[in-house]
Swiss-Prot record:
InterPro entries: ATPase_NBD (IPR043129), Chaperone_DnaK (IPR012725), Heat_shock_70_CS (IPR018181), HSP70_peptide-bd_sf (IPR029047), Hsp_70_fam (IPR013126)
PROSITE patterns xref list: HSP70_1 (PS00297), HSP70_2 (PS00329), HSP70_3 (PS01036)
Chain positions found as Phosphothreonine: 197
Key words, A-Z: ATP-binding, Chaperone, Nucleotide-binding, Phosphoprotein, Stress response
GO molecular-function terms, A-Z: ATP binding; ATP-dependent protein folding chaperone; unfolded protein binding
Pfam families associated with the record: HSP70
Protein name: Chaperone protein DnaK 3
CDD domains: ASKHA_NBD_HSP70_DnaK-like
Source species: Synechococcus sp. (strain ATCC 27144 / PCC 6301 / SAUG 1402/1)
Domain of life: Bacteria
Induction: By stress conditions e.g. heat shock.
Family: Belongs to the heat shock protein 70 family.
Function recorded in the entry: Acts as a chaperone.
Length: 655
């Protein structure tokens, strides 16, 4: 087996490492650098340029130089409007509403652009090692969706690499930090602020096991955003002074972008920096062209004011990760800062202040730590590293749609992967021959508030009374965090499934808001769930009443039937208009009273005729959304969803 390389495929820069003598080392590229800009360009003659050389010619070839492609990979067109407005190259809608880019009249997918970067990294590794390289471990942000992870694997395949594992970036950073501390028992918080993403993970290290306890983050907050506030500041000031909008000139905006990035870097070590851009534009004065220049001083304090909202936004994922892991700041032993943007002094100060003055660990290189960790995982998979176990997690819960538009979680967020969950359901209408499984991701109680991942149908179920068919539903997540869902009819053996490879990922707003909304709307969600549960109990009760009435009509008088039917109709009407907890409690009392009436009539019917046939009231849907290990039956139902003319996946769980 040849060498397995570890790759940090970054938004701004990428890095490759390999294990030598049991230790990870950075591979120096052909230009002599330890990192490679994640930039691809096509020259006038159609020649492809990657890395530092592509960055050098970006100003004079702005329209055909692609950067920050990681912000588009695996995402939908409508979710990327802000990102598309910032780049100097041309974006076009792709297949399945994805984002493609145009370079010299050729349309490329983000996977193809990423593959060009990966191909250069692979070639640099082959030159360094003196042997062919065909296998790799690639890192991705912890908050990357299933579609983004799959797209990254596809990019690796295009580059001629077999991707053995997709590893979360903060987890890889912890690996590089803890390789020589395998027998330490400690809790580590990794704060990873890269060019385009922010991830925060909390890991437990001990007995050679790296176990991720919780992860949180922002998929679209990184160094690019800090550059953008300087770009906007420069462009706004120039517009005010010269009445020229530099945003309309792609070459000018590219120069502003590069100068802003350098200013940000300078201000990490200097209190002030000068931005000097001669001949940035030309104005006409008295009929003659007059060149315009930018020469301005930017102080660190000014930059921190411009970026204050961004700095504050980096703290929220820390709070969320601590909450999810049930830990306090005092229980964190070490804080690791990784990613190039973690060098910004305001970021370091904000993190230190949040942890009550505890100094972050700055012993690892923030640009290289992730690639080094990927190389360690590559060594584990290649058999070079022994006795190291990495246990990662999923960032958001996965589940399906059930009765009443409820999102039923099958696998909770922060569950260790790889993992699988299997549950057996049954139909809830007589003669049902098909179910549609709707798979979702998120934390809210109702389907409409979560992200749809995909749908599939299981057909060919033999017609049978409700409750008879047994449908086995399985959720399986591999070590890369990629989801497979399958459904099988136990009676016929007929099966159907889906590999969630939908290209549309979560928007940045969705990811940021999803967990906040789960808390903000917790009370409203609970009322909605109780209302749906009550409605389900009522439907089961009405089904029981109608079935009993059909089989034993001769034993019930009209005087007994009429008030029951009136009560049922009144309760049905009330359930359609309930809007608060007081009304809910009133309806709950009415339902209980109706139950007692039915039980009394049933008992009387039994006394009259011992052969009476009754249909028992089914257990409620509340069982399904509670503890699934209590051995009780759990009821869900199939119903027609008239909004999209499809049958939603609603079942009765019997195991």
């Amino acid at each position: 087996m040849g060498k397995v390389i570890g790759i940090d495929l970054g938004t701004t820069n990428s890095c490759v490492a390999v294990l030598e003598g049991g230790k990870p080392i950075i591979v120096t590229n052909r230009e002599g650098d330890r990192t490679t800009p994640s930039i691809v360009a096509v020259g006038r003659k159609g020649d492809r340029i990657v890395g530092r050389m592509a960055k050098r010619q970006a100003v004079t070839n702005a329209e055909n130089t692609v950067y920050s492609i990681k912000r588009f990979i695996g995402r939908r067109w409508e979710d990327t409007e802000a990102e598309r407005s910032r780049v100097t190259y041309t974006c076009v809608p792709g297949k399945d509403d994805t984002v493609n880019v145009t370079i010299r009249d050729r349309v490329c997918t983000p996977q193809e652009i990423s593959a060009m970067v990966l191909q250069k990294l692979r070639q640099d590794a082959e030159t360094f090692l003196g042997e062919p390289v065909t296998q790799a471990v690639i890192t991705v942000p912890a908050y990357f969706t299933d579609a983004q992870r799959q797209a990254t694997k596809d990019a690796g395949a295009i580059a001629g690499l077999k991707v053995l594992r997709i590893v979360n970036e903060p987890t890889a950073a912890a690996l590089s930090y803890g390789l020589d501390k395998l027998h330490e028992n400690s809790r580590i918080l990794v704060f990873d602020l890269g060019g385009g993403t922010l991830d925060v993970s909390i890991l437990q290290l001990g007995d050679s096991v790296f176990e991720v306890k919780a992860t949180a983050g922002n998929n679209h907050l990184g160094g690019d955003d800090f550059d953008a506030v300087i770009v906007d500041w420069l462009a706004d000031n120039f517009l005010k002074a010269e009445s020229i909008d530099l945003r309309q000139d792609k070459m000018a905006i590219q120069r502003l972008r590069e100068a802003s990035e350098q200013a940000k870097i300078d201000l990490s070590t200097l209190p002030t920096t000068t931005i000097n851009l001669p001949f940035i534009a030309t104005a006409t004065v008295d009929g003659a062209p007059e060149p315009k220049h930018i020469e301005v001083e930017l102080q660190r304090e000014q930059f921190e004011v411009l970026a204050s909202n961004l700095v504050q936004a980096t703290i929220e994922p820390i709070q969320q990760a601590l909450k999810d892991s049930n830990l306090t700041i005092d229980q964190i032993d070490r804080i690791l800062l990784v990613g190039g943007s973690s060098r910004i002094p305001a970021i370091q100060q904000a993190v230190q202040k949040f942890f009550g003055g505890k100094t972050p660990d700055l012993t690892i290189n923030p640009d290289e730590a992730i690639a080094l960790g990927a190389a360690i995982q590559a060594g584990v998979l290649g058999g070079e590293v022994k006795d190291v176990l990495l246990l990662d997690v999923i960032p958001l819960s996965l589940g399906l749609e059930t009765l009443g538009g409820v999102f039923t979680k099958i696998i909770e967020r922060n569950t260790t992967i790889p993992t699988s969950r299997t549950q057996v359901f049954t139909t809830a209408t007589d003669g049902q021959v098909m179910v549609e499984v709707h798979v979702l991701q998120g934390e809210r109680a109702l389907v409409k508030d979560n992200k749809s991942l995909g749908r599939f149908q299981l057909t060919g179920i033999p017609p049978a009374p409700r409750g008879v068919p047994q449908i086995e539903l399985a959720f399986d997540i591999d070590a890369d965090g990629i989801l497979n869902v399958s459904a099988r009819d136990r009676g016929t053996g007929r099966a159907q499934g889906i590999r969630i490879t939908s290209t549309g990922g979560l928007t940045s707003d969705e990811i940021e808001a999803m967990r906040r909304d789960a808390e903000l709307y917790q009370e409203a969600d609970q009322i909605n769930l109780q209302m749906i549960e009550l409605r389900t109990q009522f439907e089961n009760l009405r089904y029981s009443f109608e079935s009993t009435l059909q089989n034993n009509r001769e034993l019930l008088t009209a005087e007994q039937q009429e008030p029951l039917e009136a009560s049922l109709n009144a309760l049905a009407s009330g359930l359609e208009s309930v809007s608060n907890e007081a009304e809910l409690n009133q309806l709950r009392q009415q339902l209980e009273a109706l139950k007692q009436q039915l039980y009394a009539i049933g008992a009387a019917a039994y006394r009259q005729d011992g052969s009476v046939t009754t249909i028992p009231v089914q257990p409620t849907f509340a069982d399904l959304i509670g503890d699934n290990d209590n051995g009780s039956n759990e009821t869900v139902a199939i119903e027609r969803n008239d909004d999209d003319a499809t049958v939603t996946a609603d079942y009765e769980a019997i195991e």
